């Protein structure tokens, strides 16, 4: 029996997106805060790349300053390459973590973008697996939807749920200090 020859490996051009590495979860976008393997942050901003550019830029800047994660439901035009290219352009030199997590939209009952979610305990952060309709309990997180700034959303959440102040406080401090 003869071994099947392996095709030659073609190294990606410098600056090109290595889809193979991306699929293995080992891609590191330049200047993007990698969320892979890190403990989940309590603060997530659910966005769509079809939102107005000015809103996306503001939220990306605020996510970088606060340490929030940008969450996408899926791919732009069903293309990982297009999605990564748009996200790289949006993030630029800022260090921002972002994930594609369609289940998080269900887990936190997100129906529009942007939606801001602040989890109040580790159980809500660690939730994995399938859920059909809002499997995070309402007591485990607070959220707000609307085209507003991150600091406004956090302040609104604290006014509605004073118990969220301890979790929201450090994020608000980082936003106000710069």
Model-derived features with residue positions:
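A short, hydrophobic beta-strand/beta-hairpin element that forms part of a small beta-sheet core
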Residues: 114-128
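Phenylalanine-focused residue identity feature
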Residues: 46, 105-108, 116, 141
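Alpha-helix boundary/capping residues
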Residues: 112, 120, 157-160
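Thioredoxin-like thiol-disulfide oxidoreductase module
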Residues: 88, 92-113
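Envelope-exposed proteins and targeting segments
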Residues: 41-43, 66, 94-96, 112-115
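Solvent-exposed loop/turn segments at secondary-structure junctions
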Residues: 76-78, 104-106, 122-124
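Non-globular targeting/processing and membrane-anchoring segments
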Residues: 1-44, 48-90, 127-178
């Amino acid at each position: 029996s003869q071994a099947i020859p392996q095709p030659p490996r073609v190294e990606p051009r410098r600056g090109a997106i290595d889809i193979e590495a991306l699929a293995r979860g080992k891609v590191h976008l330049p200047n993007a805060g990698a969320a892979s393997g890190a403990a989940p942050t309590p603060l997530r901003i659910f966005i769509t790349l079809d939102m107005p550019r000015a809103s996306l830029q503001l939220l990306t800047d605020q996510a970088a300053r606060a340490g929030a994660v940008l969450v996408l439901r899926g791919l732009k035009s069903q293309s990982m390459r297009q999605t990564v290219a748009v996200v790289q352009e949006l993030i630029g030199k800022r260090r921002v973590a972002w994930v594609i997590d369609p289940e998080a939209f269900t887990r936190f009952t997100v129906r529009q973008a942007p939606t801001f979610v602040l989890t109040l305990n580790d159980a809500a952060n660690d939730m994995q697996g399938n859920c059909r309709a809002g499997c995070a309990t309402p007591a485990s997180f607070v959220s707000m939807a609307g085209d507003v700034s991150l600091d406004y959303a956090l302040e609104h959440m604290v006014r509605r749920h004073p118990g969220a102040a301890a979790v929201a406080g450090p994020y608000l401090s980082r936003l106000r200090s710069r």
